[in-house]
A protein has these predicted regions:
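Short, Lys/Arg-enriched, Trp-marked, Pro/Gly-tolerant hinge/linker segments that flank
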Residues: 119-129, 144-157, 163-198
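Generic protein-terminus/edge-of-domain signal
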Residues: 1-66, 73, 105-121
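Short acidic (Asp/Glu) patches
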Residues: 71-77
Length: 198
């Protein structure tokens, strides 16, 4: 999709003040510990055999699924088959940057808004819409790591376009949380409630 991939970087902090994009393709990856961070994350799952847990919901990932993860949301990757190639594109966006590029009429954080009726972390776009979103991400990735004249401006423009399309998709296609994680006897839900209250 993006032409080239990069080795998986386990860091969970942004180096940039704005946004970062990654294209990972690897096998023999272990489960990732439950974690959170202070930026927005958009995760496009391309291939593999994984589940993703976000705030107590377990999502059985299918190729083309998009996960929207807000700052401070607890999430975890669960690898079901280590020998299977696992490919994904990950976009990190600083909240201040996303607010800065939004307008009063169109907040680009809306797709992450938990208070919106029908909010979900998982989006499953149709084939045509997915193709468009993948194309935008591919171009953004090439520009972000490119060195041609104006590549930073081009990448930022593609980020704007991607976020507008992502918000349109989120507003048009709500999906309910597929599986509540109950293996902990409700402990995770209690911890999340405590964190949200404090």
């Amino acid at each position: 999709m993006c032409g080239r991939t990069q080795p998986f970087d386990p860091r969970q902090q942004m180096k940039s003040q704005g946004y970062e994009i990654f294209h990972y393709k690897d096998s023999q990856l272990d489960n990732v510990a439950v974690h959170h961070h202070d930026f927005f994350e958009v995760y496009l799952f391309l291939s593999g055999n994984v589940d993703y847990s976000v705030e107590g919901c377990i999502y059985h990932m299918e190729g083309g699924d998009l996960l929207l993860i807000s700052p401070q949301e607890l999430h975890q990757l669960k690898v079901n088959a280590k020998e299977t190639m696992y490919e994904r594109i990950v976009l990190w966006i600083a909240p201040a940057y996303l607010s800065k590029i939004s307008t009063a009429e169109a907040s680009l954080t809306r797709c992450f808004d938990h208070s919106r009726p029908g909010h979900t972390n998982l989006l499953r776009p149709g084939k045509n819409r997915l193709g468009g979103l993948r194309g935008i991400l591919s171009e953004m990735y090439q520009e972000f790591y490119g060195n041609e004249y104006g590549h930073e401006i081009a990448a930022s423009g593609l980020l704007l376009r991607f976020m507008v399309e992502l918000n349109r998709l989120a507003l048009a296609q709500p999906v309910a949380c597929p599986d509540q994680e109950d293996r902990s006897g409700g402990f995770i839900q209690q911890v999340l409630a405590y964190i949200n209250d404090h």
